[in-house]
Amino acid sequence: CPNDLGRDAELAAKVGQQTGFQIILATGLYKQSEGAYAYWHFRSNFGESIVDLMADLFIADLTEGIGDTGIKAGIIKVASGPNEITEYENNILLAAAKASVATGAPITTHTDQGTMGDAQQKILTDNGVPAHRIIIGHSCGTDNHEYHMGLARSGSYLGFDRFGIDMVFPDEKRISSLVKVLKAGAGDRVVVSHDSVWCWKGQPFPPGMLAQVPDAFDPTHFERKIIPRLREEGISAEQIEGLLVENPRRFFSGEKLSALA
């Protein structure tokens, strides 16, 4: 989660310590319709550079720690809504680029309905971020193969990262799109996951939500249901290992990707 979606650094650290999972916290800001737009709009009335203020916040989270916790973020999260990037969202992208260039931190994005990932990529790379340091998140929100391959050829990672949320886009279409990308030779630039929230501001999940998307809140869903389907489609164990282990390792280590035809 970015800064304005209920991020809890101390809870994440505690979970990581007790489970052994390596949890990488994010800094960043969410899209205009659901994030902290009102606050930043208010700040803009005082003649300050909103991009600089945002970038300073991201850099502090990455280099000094989140608030007074001493826990540092390790990635920048940005977002845009469907079919357009608003001025506010553009400012977030510019601030993220500035912070990434200053610190070397990678960036992951939120997209809606499989749109605007190419525009996000262009804004970030035009402002100095190497393409291989970017994940275009929720790329699995569309089955547009040319959109996927355009992002891949431009050197960024595709986030097929919403498995289990069939009400947004069905898993079978996600699987089909992922298989096409893998068979097109772009399997080294795909990362996979669920898009799950594990703590709802300290309260139980609303029962109605759980009933609608039970797989979204099952951390074994990808292993139990998606991997077998990938195998049925001819995806090898080596390719699956790449999705789960090698690609995330390469992304966070900053290794460059080879050119894609």
List the predicted regions and their residue ranges:
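N-terminal hydrophobic targeting/anchoring segments and the immediately downstream early-domain regions
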Residues: C1-A38, L158, I227, F251-A261
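Active-site beta-loop-alpha junctions enriched in small/polar residues
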Residues: C1-N3, G28-Q32, G81, D112-G114, ...
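Alpha-helical scaffolding segments of alpha/beta enzyme cores, especially the outer helices
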Residues: E10-K14, Q18, L57-A60, E64, ...
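Active-site gating/metal-coordination segments in enzymes
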Residues: K14-Q17, Q22-V101, P106, Y157, ...
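Divalent metal-coordination and catalytic microenvironments
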Residues: L29, S100, L158, D195, ...
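Active-site core of metal-dependent hydrolases
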Residues: A102-R174, G208-T220, I227, E232-S236
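Short acidic/histidine-rich active-site segments
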Residues: D161-R162, A186-L210, I240
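Mid-to-C-terminal alpha-helical segments outside catalytic/metal-binding sites
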Residues: F217-A261
